């Protein structure tokens, strides 16, 4: 079994209403994480995208984000488990590395709830 470690972390600005797109939001955190790890997108051999589409009006963001971040043609997985999406994504990345299927996996968790009104957000919880 391969050893696993989190080697870089990043986070976009935490604001009430992010002014950019979902791609830009994820890129901000991704850029910080790969810088923290001393990696480039080319060093990553798989990615896990984690979100809840009910809140950000983006039904299937995995492929779009992987392409935007320069992670293609590597495998990209999509995890959707509402509030636990990112922790579920970390578990998937752990399994991918311990199994030997992949060596370096980026986990990209995001939520942009400002795309819908507060009342809509509460209805969807």
Protein language model regions, located:
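Conserved "HGTGT" condensation-loop signature of ketosynthase/thiolase-family condensing enzymes
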Residues: 1-76, 95-99, 106-125
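Active-site nucleophile and cofactor-binding loops and adjacent substrate-binding regions
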Residues: 76-86
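Conserved phosphate-binding catalytic cores of ATP/NTP-utilizing and phosphoryl-transfer enzymes
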Residues: 87-95
């Amino acid at each position: 079994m391969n050893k696993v470690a989190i080697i870089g972390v990043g986070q976009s600005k935490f604001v009430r209403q992010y002014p950019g797109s979902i791609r830009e939001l994820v890129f901000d955190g991704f850029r910080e994480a790969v810088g923290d790890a001393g990696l480039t997108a080319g060093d990553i051999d798989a990615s896990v995208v984690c979100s809840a589409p009910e809140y950000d009006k983006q039904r299937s963001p995995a492929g779009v984000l992987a392409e935007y971040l320069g992670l293609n043609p590597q495998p990209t997985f999509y995890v959707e488990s509402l509030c636990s999406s990112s922790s579920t994504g970390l578990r998937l990345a752990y399994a991918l590395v311990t199994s030997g299927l992949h060596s370096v996996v980026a986990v990209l968790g995001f939520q942009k709830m400002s795309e819908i009104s507060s009342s809509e957000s509460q209805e969807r919880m």
